[in-house]
Amino acid sequence: MAGRESDAVSLAGVVLAGGESRRMGRDKATLVLPGGSTTMVEHVLGIVGQRCEPVFVMAAQGQPLPPLQVPVLRDELRGLGPLPATGRGLRAAAEAGARFAFVCAVDMPGLTVDLIDDLVRSAIETDAEVVLPWDGRSHYLAAIYRTDLAERVDALVAAGERKMSALADSSDTQRIVMSDSAPLANVNTAADLPAPVRPGH
């Protein structure tokens, strides 16, 4: 698209790859997508990396991953969901000098750079702390977060919060209505996999 907003703002990427994948029955990050040899984590990194720099992968302790050209940070707290991993990713992004981070789940093969651009545009225009896509529900793991929210995440986790909604509810949050839900779709079973997968654009 003309005038990539992500070029005008310091935007890091945080890909959450350490989920337990109970319904899939196997690690989603290393799932090979139909029509090739690319794993889910490599596919999502290929999209996020077009708009975000640096990009961090949050993974579970001992979780096997293919060789990646980005930093991999291992979960310090196991079994607590995506909130503490998001906080650690935001802190790493802040330390790298980024003001915003696009945080997403690893199981989003339909993710597009256009979605990232739309969210970044809103973040710039509103200076909101959180910008979420909304298609009838809020998508917390395909959203823009200010990196200075890392301390707020720590406080929420220390208070016993586990849900990403707790961070959005305690922040200046903007929601963007999405007419196309395809880029937001998660893969929970093999039947959810698209075939073939097209690179996001």
UniProtKB/Swiss-Prot annotation:
| InterPro entries on file | MobA-like_NTP_Trfase, Molybde_CF_guanTrfase, Nucleotide-diphossugar_trans
Where do the annotations place GTP binding? 16-18, 28, 75, 107
For this protein, what is any one GO molecular function term? GTP binding
EC number in record: 2.7.7.77
Keywords from the UniProt entry? Cytoplasm, GTP-binding, Magnesium, Metal-binding, Molybdenum cofactor biosynthesis, Nucleotide-binding, Transferase
Positions bound to Mg(2+):
107
GO-annotated cellular components: cytoplasm
Q: Name the cofactor(s).
A: Mg(2+)
Primary localization class, coarse? cytoplasm
What family is reported?
Belongs to the MobA family.
Q: Which PANTHER family match?
A: MOLYBDENUM COFACTOR GUANYLYLTRANSFERASE
Under the heading HAMAP family, the entry gives: MobA
Q: What is known of its domains?
A: The N-terminal domain determines nucleotide recognition and specific binding, while the C-terminal domain determines the specific binding to the target protein.
Query: What is known about what this protein does?
Result: Transfers a GMP moiety from GTP to Mo-molybdopterin (Mo-MPT) cofactor (Moco or molybdenum cofactor) to form Mo-molybdopterin guanine dinucleotide (Mo-MGD) cofactor.
Protein name as it appears in the record: Probable molybdenum cofactor guanylyltransferase
